């Protein structure tokens, strides 16, 4: 029961669905004969939902839970609804939809908005705002935020406590920065972005040049003069870092979703609607196409080009360009330690074994 409306605010199921952003999802209701449509106060899983909550079935492995769920209504696919009808199963109001997971997402968004504390617009008295900064009258700036010179905060934007917006940076309309987000100078965040706590955008990229005048093996710093540009409808997870470009900006396209603890180095470009799971490291100047997915803990070398519609499995090390859409995996499977040691010993001898095999073939 993650979200519940007060009893007086419960909504009839059809009213709730009509009030969500469910247009185009082609849903309809299937109710037992003479059943009244339930009033809904929340949303939950099949195993945890109560009698005033709606649930959903999108993964067939949980289909057996339909028989025991207490949910007032369940979102299912047309195939599941037809199968239940043929089996004579009854008792639940069904919301029949080709995309139950997407309809669940829309409902979750509605409940999140409905339960969000409204809070007044304005700037908290403890915030420090440079006189040249521009803050829209409908924006909300939390306690102990710092807004530096020339920064702009758009209409309906919300900044949680302790956020820092550097000089000349912008936060677009209706964007949400959770507590302690840091935007260095020259970082531009689009509209409807969500940035979670601890994220840092615009820190210096890792740029150094060998400089023998400073000593043997010494490095001279290369100032990072670019910025960071984040598109519309982007979400950035907690403690993710996006470095500023050396000269050109680091770019995160529209609709990109970044999980927690991702490292995006300087001058990386991430195409629209790409989703990247936690703990991925992307080295400098790599370009990732649109609609890609990158599994957790993957590593991408620098100066690479990744095509559109590429799916990279978790833990993969990408060290060369990927020019063709598709799924790519480069993970050595786990095994019991003793077996892994034996396999590793064989791998180290592959070149020798190959030479021996070729010699045998020539005989």
UniProtKB/Swiss-Prot annotation:
InterPro entries: Hexapep, Hexapep_transf_CS, LpxD, Trimer_LpxA-like_sf, UDP_GlcNAc_AcTrfase_non-rep. This is UDP-3-O-acylglucosamine N-acyltransferase. The lineage of its organism: Bacteria, Pseudomonadati, Pseudomonadota, Betaproteobacteria, Burkholderiales. Catalyzes the N-acylation of UDP-3-O-acylglucosamine using 3-hydroxyacyl-ACP as the acyl donor. Is involved in the biosynthesis of lipid A, a phosphorylated glycolipid that anchors the lipopolysaccharide to the outer membrane of the cell. It catalyses: a UDP-3-O-[(3R)-3-hydroxyacyl]-alpha-D-glucosamine + a (3R)-hydroxyacyl-[ACP] = a UDP-2-N,3-O-bis[(3R)-3-hydroxyacyl]-alpha-D-glucosamine + holo-[ACP] + H(+). One of its GO terms (molecular function) is N-acyltransferase activity. Keywords: Acyltransferase, Lipid A biosynthesis, Lipid biosynthesis, Lipid metabolism, Repeat, Transferase. Belongs to the transferase hexapeptide repeat family. LpxD subfamily. Homotrimer. PROSITE patterns: HEXAPEP_TRANSFERASES. Pathway: Bacterial outer membrane biogenesis; LPS lipid A biosynthesis. HAMAP family: LpxD. Its EC number is 2.3.1.191. GO terms for biological process: lipid A biosynthetic process. It holds the Pfam family Hexapep_2. It comes from Bordetella bronchiseptica (strain ATCC BAA-588 / NCTC 13252 / RB50) (Alcaligenes bronchisepticus). The keyword Acyltransferase applies.
